[in-house]
UniProtKB/Swiss-Prot annotation:
Phylogenetic placement of the source organism: Bacteria, Pseudomonadati, Pseudomonadota, Gammaproteobacteria, Enterobacterales
Subcellular location: Cytoplasm
Catalysed transformations (reactions): an acyl-CoA + acetyl-CoA = a 3-oxoacyl-CoA + CoA
Gene Ontology MF term list: acetyl-CoA C-acyltransferase activity
PANTHER family linked to this entry: 3-KETOACYL-COA THIOLASE FADA, 3-KETOACYL-COA THIOLASE, PEROXISOMAL
SUPFAM superfamilies noted in UniProt: Thiolase-like
Active site residues according to the UniProt entry: 91 (acyl-thioester intermediate), 343 (proton acceptor), 373 (proton acceptor)
Protein name: 3-ketoacyl-CoA thiolase
Top EC class, one word: transferase
Function: Catalyzes the final step of fatty acid oxidation in which acetyl-CoA is released and the CoA ester of a fatty acid two carbons shorter is formed.
């Protein structure tokens, strides 16, 4: 079986969905920009040598519809002979794209794959056109389709207080802002064209979603967003709405050697699991455990974790049950997470994997794990190993 390596991993800045930098930029353009960038950064790879493109996207309608992977590839002037497929596992879409490509390479059905994902939540809202089958209520609580209420459920089940959530959210913004100021994101962000507040076209090389002024005190003034009577989850402790894309270049280790490209990391293991939709945010726990089992590792072997911050009330129970509460500041989301950067649904799996690989390089870490919860009760995880 072929070893799968990550040769490159990049992303756009995260733009604010409401009147943000990418309000006049389409999702296909964000995607095509990264596809072109990966090729220009790795000139020994001919675009025609790409065997397939896997691109995550959740709301596949309007500008994100009709196979956005193919539309973006055509915009990027990738040869018509290169196929492209749009992948949807809700929040885990672009990590699923990574898994699909990795399996193709492992089995020898592909040698080179370009993967990634995008979501323009400003142009295509998360709830656009969603129409749940009424019969689902026989098997699943209606509230299980409301992500904020599933976070409230986890908070109650695991004793996660409002103060704990506010502290974690403030940490996310503080860490993301510190990473921005120190240049820690520079290696992963590709400057991307957008418009400033006055409508002037400019190049953005920073995440505009981060709120550096965020403190526990300011967060404590916010009202519950989903359960106004007894709730503890607020907009401030939920992932921000943002627009963005992320992309990675995968290939077999032997193909990388042929092309003279230096692998940055190896895919060590992958896992996807299901869980009760009412606690969908708990999915990273069984997914991470399964990925670690497949890799022959334990949580203590992992040097760095990237766990998608759908909600503070969701990620804290996962950290607790993975036995990592005492290691948050040493191992988990060291540059902040989706509470500060946002969670463009189809982008996030590739985004956290990209951030993880860059973080592993900075810390000279051997193993890293990226994981995320998925709406309606799933979890997905990937273990990476530095090459």
């Amino acid at each position: 079986m072929e070893q799968v390596v990550i040769v490159d991993a990049i992303r756009t800045p995260m733009g604010r969905s409401k009147g943000g930098a990418f309000r006049h930029v389409r999702a296909e353009d964000l995607s095509a920009h990264l596809m072109r960038s990966l090729l220009s950064r790795n000139p020994s790879l001919e675009a025609s040598a790409i065997d397939d493109i896997y691109w995550g996207c959740v709301q596949q309608t309007l500008e994100q519809g009709f196979n956005i992977a193919r539309n973006a590839a055509l915009l990027a002037e990738i040869p018509h002979s290169v196929p492209a497929n749009t992948v949807n596992r809700l929040c885990g879409s672009s990590m699923q794209a990574l898994h699909d490509a990795a399996r193709m390479i492992m089995t020898g059905d592909a040698g080179v794959c370009l993967i990634g994902g995008v979501e323009h939540m400003g142009h295509v809202p998360m709830s656009h056109g969603v129409d749940f089958h009424p019969g689902l209520s026989r098997n699943v609580a209606k509230a299980a389709g409301m992500m904020g209420l599933t976070a409230e459920m986890l908070a109650r089940l695991h004793g996660i207080s409002r103060e704990m959530q506010d502290q974690f959210a403030a940490r996310s913004h503080a860490r993301a802002w510190a990473a921005t100021q120190s240049g820690a994101f520079k290696a992963e962000i590709i400057p991307t064209g957008g418009h400033d507040a006055d409508g002037v076209l400019k190049s953005f090389n920073y995440d505009e979603v981060i709120r550096p002024e965020t403190t526990v005190e300011t967060l404590s003034t916010l009202k519950p967003a989903f359960d106004p009577v007894t709730g503890t989850v607020t907009a401030g402790t939920s992932s921000a709405l943002s627009d963005g894309a992320a992309a990675m270049l995968l290939m077999s280790e032997s193909r990388a050697r042929e092309l003279g490209l230096k692998p940055r990391a190896r895919v060590r293991s992958m896992a996807v699991v299901g869980c009760d939709p009412s606690i969908m945010g708990y999915g990273p726990v069984p997914a991470s455990k399964l990925a670690l089992k497949k890799a022959g590792l334990s949580t203590s072997d992992i040097d760095v974790f990237e766990m998608n911050e759908a909600f503070a009330a969701q990620i804290l129970p996962c950290i607790k049950d993975l036995g990592l509460m005492e290691q948050i500041d040493e191992k988990i989301n060291l540059n902040g997470g989706a509470i500060a950067l946002g969670h463009p649904l189809g982008c996030s799996g590739a985004r956290i994997s990209t951030t993880l690989i860059n973080q592993m390089e900075r810390k000279d870490a051997q193993f890293g794990l990226a994981t995320m919860c998925i709406g309606l009760g799933q979890g997905i995880a990937t273990v990476f190993e530095r090459v």
